[in-house]
Amino acid sequence: VFRPDDVIRIDPDKFEKKEITLNEYLELFQQYPSLGFDAYQRLYAALRMFGTEEPKKPWKPKRWKFLDDRIESPWKRAGATSPFEIYLYGIEEPVNEIMRYLEDACINRDAQSRFFILIGPPSSAKTDLINLMSYTLDGFGTLPEGELYTVKFNLKENSDLFYGLEEVICPAHENPLNFLPRDKVRELLKKVNEELSFTDEFDTVCIGCPHCSLNE
């Protein structure tokens, strides 16, 4: 996903809930592999979709354009619903460090166990940075490439075994790919990975949600 000059407008009135079969999801996944991204890949894809602005002077760090605030959303704080209202500058270097961390986490499972802490004096844009990252992730979720799917179990035929529940939705947004036979999902991911960059590739090791594992 690359939208260097775009502004994403979030309109909750246009949101829709849809249910599709696993086969339909697989068709969408092959069209938009980003539907299968893990949390790190989703955030990294969202923050980089607007691209970067190369510095005019070689000793200055590049600037990620999501810092310009390219999201129009009714959920933004303090009434700043329009784009370009939370323009951040002067923090390009720490943001580059965060982006390098996310890139590493996309390709290295061990790096996902790390965490970063924003340390700085009052009014140094720590909260605004996290808010911008959150708004940008919200905007990514409104795109076809950023839709987020989870799994719903139909328990009608065995509801007596689940205290009368007729359906259960995964609380952890389980990746539907984890419900494919392991040999099939490895074959599918290998095929998809051939067309992706290294930060977008999928790990063929699937770890299922414990809650959903009990319902399989």
Located regions from the model:
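N-terminal accessory nucleic-acid engagement/regulatory domains that precede
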Residues: V1-E24
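Conserved ASCE/P-loop NTPase catalytic core
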Residues: I20-E216
